[in-house]
């Protein structure tokens, strides 16, 4: 028996034992989904999104990894890839993302995005800056933050610059971050 403290409470559990091999296809599928989700989370290390998940985890009384997995595991498939890009959450927060996000103009690797500012104008969130996560189809488990992104929530528009030579499909994840990084 192993005794340990977590959040000020004393717990006991069995001593770890050697893991059994996965037997069913369904178990293998979920094990692969879990591995892909963890790989994706680890790649967020250099993208400065881990602190967002760590803060959310503290609110949920879990660690950041568990908060990320609970929010994103459904997006991954059993082949160590992403099956549903719409289910990916780069970040989570209490403020809603504005309605009517759309790409209005594309010139080379630069995109102009616009959104409806209607209900946010009276909120303190009007000074939040636009952030954009990018997943390229040729590297689905390596998310990046778009560099050279401009846009403030209250302005209703922003510019995004993607990496040069984009020929394949990519997925954009727009969210807003306060000036102090929350």
Predicted regions: what is each one?
Residues 1-99:
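Long, polar/Ser/Thr-enriched low-complexity segments
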Residues 57-182:
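Charged linear interaction tracts used for macromolecular binding and regulation
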